[in-house]
Amino acid sequence: MPLNVSFTDWNYDLEYDSVQPYFYCDEEENFYQQQQQSELQPPAPSEDIWKKFELLPTPPLSPSRRSGLCSPSYVAVASFSPRGDDDGGGGSFSTADQLEMVTELLGGDMVNQSFICDPDDETFIKNIIIQDCMWSGFSAAAKLVSEKLASYQAARKDSSSPSPARGHGGCSTSSLYLQDLSAAASECIDPSVVFPYPLNDSSSPKPCASPDSTAFSPSSDSLLSSTESSPQASPEPLTLHEETPPTTSSDSEEEQEDEEEIDVVSVEKRQPPAKRSESGSPSAGGHSKPPHSPLVLKRCHVSTHQHNYAAPPSTRKDYPAAKRAKLDSGRVLKQISNNRKCASPRSSDTEENDKRRTHNVLERQRRNELKRSFFALRDQIPELENNEKAPKVVILKKATAYILSVQAEEQKLISEKDLLRKRREQLKHKLEQLRNSCA
């Protein structure tokens, strides 16, 4: 851990020293000073302002975060692997074996040739990417790794131990190498930040199985133990997969937010998603956010009854008036009860719509009853009995005239009845006189 802190501070100082001419106007002529000595490099921005954009069209891929397997430091460690006798155990590898192991671990397509060059090469130092302020940390990391390897090599020469002990010490030294390399790899740029989409279409990583990988079991065991014991290493055990960008905390948070999408159709609260297992890493609990599930309204289907006003009314029904009124009242009450069965939080607009709908139903019932009354009145008038298209005004006039005529006939019949009663009384009195005279 102290090595990592000192490396970070030293890296920041180195980057500040490399980009210090950027912040002073009087030193603008010294921009890309080493590039002016080479004819192959583009000119400084002071000569032509548009020449400073002549970088690579696409930035190179950042070093992989999988314990620094693709970085040049891993190649240096592989070349500096402790060697012993041929019968000394699993730590004795020849140069051909080491190259074969690197080829099997990384694969021919995954090895970037720009990262396997010598860090001390002159072309590597004069590279514009190394001198750029954004990519200068890579050269600093490589230089730091080379210095550490030189110090470890000097310490290895000073130590004198027998071959079995030397083999065990070689494993521990390689574990220290991998620990420092994993710490340096953690300072690299995450490829998922630069490239948000994976480089290949494989959704799940597949382990690279090779029959010759079992020959290097001791070194792989030491690699796993050193990776698990290192605090800067990833919490998962080191496995060889295809080159896919690792899942960071931001990606996990985005996946969790995608799982918490709200269903706007249902009124029930969405159950919080299952908590992720805490066995992955102890820092995973710090990134987890409490799921929020707001209450949403449920869609309510309001049934509306459509009536065909153009259809002619059925006037020749044999139903009595009382029975028809009872059926219509029952139908209206059923419609009102169905309209009130809307199971949703009622607002002022909903209540107003219900009142308007109820008023329309009652008004329609009143008009139908009035129309049936006119039809019944038309049937009672002798002149309009067979006229189904008689207007209401004619029905009212004919009904009034018919009522007046009926009333006049009634008065005539009442007066005639009175005359007949008087005649009856006279006849009864005359009959009594005749009986008395005969007696």
Curated annotation (Swiss-Prot):
GO molecular function: DNA binding; DNA-binding transcription factor activity, RNA polymerase II-specific; E-box binding; protein dimerization activity; protein-containing complex binding
Positions bearing carbohydrate: 58
Protein name: Myc proto-oncogene protein
N6-acetyllysine sites (modified residues): 143, 148, 157, 275, 317, 323, 371
Function: Transcription factor that binds DNA in a non-specific manner, yet also specifically recognizes the core sequence 5'-CAC[GA]TG-3'. Activates the transcription of growth-related genes. Binds to the VEGFA promoter, promoting VEGFA production and subsequent sprouting angiogenesis. Regulator of somatic reprogramming, controls self-renewal of embryonic stem cells. Functions with TAF6L to activate target gene expression through RNA polymerase II pause release.
Residues bearing the modification Phosphoserine: 6, 62, 71, 81, 151, 159, 161, 293, 314, 329, 344, 347-348
Alphabetic keyword roster: Acetylation, Activator, Chromosome, Cytoplasm, DNA-binding, Glycoprotein, Isopeptide bond, Nucleus, Phosphoprotein, Proto-oncogene, Transcription, Transcription regulation, Ubl conjugation
Taxonomy, superkingdom: Eukaryota
UniProt keyword annotation of DNA-binding present: yes
Main localization, broad class: nucleus
Lineage: Eukaryota, Metazoa, Chordata, Craniata, Vertebrata
Low complexity bias: start-end ranges: 210-238
Comp. bias regions, Polar residues: 335-347
Residues in bHLH domain copies: 354-406
Crosslinked residue numbers (Glycyl lysine isopeptide (Lys-Gly) (interchain with G-Cter in SUMO2)): 52, 143, 148, 298
Composition bias, Acidic residues: 251-263
Location of the protein in the cell: Nucleus, Nucleoplasm; Nucleus, Nucleolus; Nucleus; Cytoplasm
Motif (9aaTAD): 100-108
Start and end residues of each stretch annotated as Disordered: 201-364
Modification(s) after translation: Phosphorylated by PRKDC. Phosphorylation at Ser-329 by PIM2 leads to the stabilization of MYC. Phosphorylation at Ser-62 by CDK2 prevents Ras-induced senescence. Phosphorylated at Ser-62 by DYRK2; this primes the protein for subsequent phosphorylation by GSK3B at Thr-58. Phosphorylation at Thr-58 and Ser-62 by GSK3 is required for ubiquitination and degradation by the proteasome. Dephosphorylation at multiple sites by the PNUTS-PP1 complex promotes MYC stability by preventing ubiquitination by the SCF(FBXW7) complex. Ubiquitinated by the SCF(FBXW7) complex when phosphorylated at Thr-58 and Ser-62, leading to its degradation by the proteasome. Ubiquitination is counteracted by USP28 in the nucleoplasm and USP36 in the nucleolus, both interacting with of FBXW7, leading to its deubiquitination and preventing degradation. Also polyubiquitinated by the DCX(TRPC4AP) complex. Ubiquitinated by UBR5 when not forming a heterodimer with another bHLH protein, leading to its degradation: UBR5 recognizes and binds a degron that is only available upon heterodimer dissociation.
Any Pfam family the entry gives: Myc-LZ
Known partners and oligomeric status: Efficient DNA binding requires dimerization with another bHLH protein. Binds DNA as a heterodimer with MAX. Interacts with TAF1C and SPAG9. Interacts with PARP10. Interacts with KDM5A and KDM5B. Interacts (when phosphorylated at Thr-58 and Ser-62) with FBXW7. Interacts with PIM2. Interacts with RIOX1. The heterodimer MYC:MAX interacts with ABI1; the interaction may enhance MYC:MAX transcriptional activity. Interacts with TRIM6. Interacts with NPM1; the binary complex is recruited to the promoter of MYC target genes and enhances their transcription. Interacts with NUP205.
GO biological process, alphabetically ordered: chromatin remodeling; chromosome organization; DNA damage response; G1/S transition of mitotic cell cycle; intracellular iron ion homeostasis; MAPK cascade; negative regulation of apoptotic process; negative regulation of cell division
Biased composition (Basic and acidic residues): 266-278, 315-331
GO cellular component, as recorded: cytoplasm; nucleolus; nucleoplasm; nucleus
